[in-house]
């Protein structure tokens, strides 16, 4: 038989040592102290006595306060863990409770009643506020009655409302001065003659009020909404000058001028003017005379005669036109680009060399 199922009278004394002993009514319940919420957790309570919404893996909602857990639940919201609205700690084990510290407006209404005043001061000295120096300056100026403060007054506001900056004044005070000088949102105002004191006043520019969202400084300004008059003027301008009927842009002069047609399209540039030297002109003239003498012979093919006639005619007209007016810019482009090539006897194709086998070289005997 299993020793666990044995009756109580048959169990050995050694097994009784490992069984939990029932607690007396006069004994205090087990209590554990946790650092995360600083509350007492009773270990011997029956599960039915707990609220249905209590669970270890329950849904956690982070506090809105930027100071970490400072906006978390305190001892005053403990009725969620007890069936009655009575205080969380039972009356039988209650001790003289501490006085709850009033919530400070500078820390977003944090519930710090479960801590002593000395502990709160030490905690806030270690936690740095999640605000930039520009935001701290803007908060100080906006909370002033006349919306202006001196440099020493800004120091005083930051030190009084944020204990973190009390321990080291040299570092953050230099940062405050640099932000006042470099940020355009802060304007310097000279003191009046009747106002005794030292130092100028600093105020916040009215155009930069929208640059601070929830105490944080925005690097870029918010776009301003256009006025109704500006919208109407822009609409009329778009109606008068639609995008599809815009005037063509003016033509800028280029390094290579082009001739424009009446329709506005540019033509291709004219061919370059060929300048002939006297020696080259005499050479071409002698070649033309030789070919003219060759054409007087009888050719068996009419196609060769026609081709030779076209070559001589085109070459003669080109030489005469260039000699009369070498700087003319309006000569026919078809004559320049579509002229048939001219072949000498030394560079004729194979089928032309068979037709003139007995023609001697052009410069034979001169060298």
Swiss-Prot record:
Highest taxon of the lineage: Eukaryota
GO molecular function: DNA binding; DNA-binding transcription factor activity, RNA polymerase II-specific; RNA polymerase II cis-regulatory region sequence-specific DNA binding; sequence-specific DNA binding
Name this protein carries in UniProt: Forkhead box protein I1-B
Bias (Basic and acidic residues) ranges: 233-246
Alphabetical UniProt keywords: Developmental protein, Differentiation, DNA-binding, Neurogenesis, Nucleus, Transcription, Transcription regulation
Protein's organism: Xenopus laevis (African clawed frog)
Residue numbers spanned by region Disordered: 1-21, 213-274
Classification via InterPro entries: Fork_head_dom, FOX_domain-containing, TF_fork_head_CS_1, TF_fork_head_CS_2, WH-like_DNA-bd_sf, WH_DNA-bd_sf
The keyword Transcription regulation belongs to this UniProt entry's keyword annotation: yes
């Amino acid at each position: 038989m299993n020793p666990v199922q044995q009756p109580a009278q048959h169990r050995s004394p050694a097994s009784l040592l490992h069984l939990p002993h029932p607690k007396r009514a006069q004994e205090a319940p087990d209590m554990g102290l946790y650092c995360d919420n600083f509350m007492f957790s009773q270990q011997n309570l029956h599960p039915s006595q707990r609220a249905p919404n209590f669970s270890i893996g329950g849904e956690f909602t982070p506090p809105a306060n930027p100071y970490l857990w400072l906006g978390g639940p305190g001892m005053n919201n403990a009725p969620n863990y007890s069936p009655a609205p009575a205080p969380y700690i039972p009356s039988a084990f209650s001790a003289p409770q501490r006085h709850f510290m009033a919530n400070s407006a500078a820390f977003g209404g944090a519930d710090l009643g479960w801590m002593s005043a000395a502990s709160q001061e030490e905690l806030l000295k270690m936690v740095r506020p999640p605000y930039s120096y520009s935001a701290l300056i803007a908060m100080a100026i906006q909370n002033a009655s006349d919306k202006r403060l001196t440099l020493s007054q800004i120091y005083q506001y930051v030190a009084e409302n944020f204990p973190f900056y009390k321990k080291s004044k040299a570092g953050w005070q230099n940062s405050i001065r640099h932000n006042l000088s470099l940020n355009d949102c802060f304007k310097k105002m000279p003191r009046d003659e009747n106002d005794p004191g030292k130092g100028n006043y600093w105020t916040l520019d009215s155009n930069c009020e929208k640059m601070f969202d929830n105490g944080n400084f925005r690097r870029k300004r918010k776009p301003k909404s256009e006025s109704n008059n500006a919208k109407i003027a822009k609409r009329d301008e778009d109606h008068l000058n639609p995008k599809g009927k815009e005037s063509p842009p003016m033509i800028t002069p280029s390094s290579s001028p082009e001739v424009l047609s009446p329709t506005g399209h540019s033509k291709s540039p004219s061919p370059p003017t060929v300048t002939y030297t006297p020696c080259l002109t005499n050479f071409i003239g002698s070649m033309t005379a030789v070919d003219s003498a060759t054409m007087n012979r009888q050719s068996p093919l009419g196609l060769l005669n026609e081709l030779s006639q076209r070559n001589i005619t085109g070459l003669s007209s080109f030489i005469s036109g260039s000699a009369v007016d070498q700087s003319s810019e309006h000569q026919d482009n078809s004559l320049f680009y579509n002229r048939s090539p001219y072949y000498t006897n030394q560079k004729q194709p194979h089928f032309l060399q068979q037709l003139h086998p007995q023609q001697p070289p052009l410069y034979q005997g001169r060298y």
